[in-house]
Amino acid sequence: MKSVITTTISAADAAGRFPSSSDLESVQGNIQRAAARLEAAEKLASNHEAVVKEAGDACFAKYSYLKNPGEAGDSQEKVNKCYRDVDHYMRLVNYCLVVGGTGPVDEWGIAGAREVYRTLNLPTSAYVASFAFARDRLCVPRDMSAQAGVEYAGNLDYIINSLC
């Protein structure tokens, strides 16, 4: 799984060298942000059901046509699958916060997602709206510290940009 630490070590090993000073500074910065990432991961884990429900609700509020006949959410089963997908991505955000890199999203979420959604007639814009809502709903310090919020929002931005 890709993280700042594994990427740094892999690059140094591939070049047959020890990690450079700048490599080590990057790793140290990553380690210093670890407490904030873990705080964000803990808050997300303890509130994930509400986060997923609110994000999914925001998606269907913004794109109400999705519940029309022939659309991606025209049955309760399809609506449930959309919420399931949002839940899946929020778990991946949690994993990314824990490992300190985008590896979980890259490996289990992004690869081929746009193509799958297009094939199934699921608009990626609806998922983007869900993740943007989850990001924008964050209230510092009510929900988490400022640095934890930066880490959380950064991971959601990564998913949003990957789906656009």
Swiss-Prot record:
Kindly list the biological process annotations in GO that this record carries. Answer: photosynthesis
List residues binding (2R,3E)-phycoerythrobilin 2: C139
Q: How does it assemble?
A: Heterodimer of an alpha and a beta chain.
A Gene Ontology cellular-component term: chloroplast thylakoid membrane
Taxonomic lineage of this organism? Eukaryota, Rhodophyta, Bangiophyceae, Bangiales, Bangiaceae
The subcellular location is: Plastid, Chloroplast thylakoid membrane
Q: Which PANTHER family match?
A: C-PHYCOCYANIN ALPHA SUBUNIT, PHYCOBILISOME 32.1 KDA LINKER POLYPEPTIDE, PHYCOCYANIN-ASSOCIATED, ROD 2-RELATED
Give the top-rank taxon of the lineage listed in the UniProt record for this protein: Eukaryota
Q: Where does (2R,3E)-phycoerythrobilin 1 bind?
A: C82
Query: What does this gene product do?
Result: Light-harvesting photosynthetic bile pigment-protein from the phycobiliprotein complex.
Give the record's membrane topology.
Peripheral membrane protein
* Keyword field contains NADP: no
Cite the InterPro entries for this sequence: Globin-like_sf, Phycobilisome_asu/bsu, Phycobilisome_asu/bsu_sf
Supply the name of the protein.
Answer: R-phycoerythrin alpha chain
State the organism of origin.
Answer: Pyropia yezoensis (Susabi-nori)
Query: Membrane-spanning residues where?
Result: none
Q: Which family does it belong to?
A: Belongs to the phycobiliprotein family.
**Posttranslational modification:** Contains two covalently linked bilin chromophores.
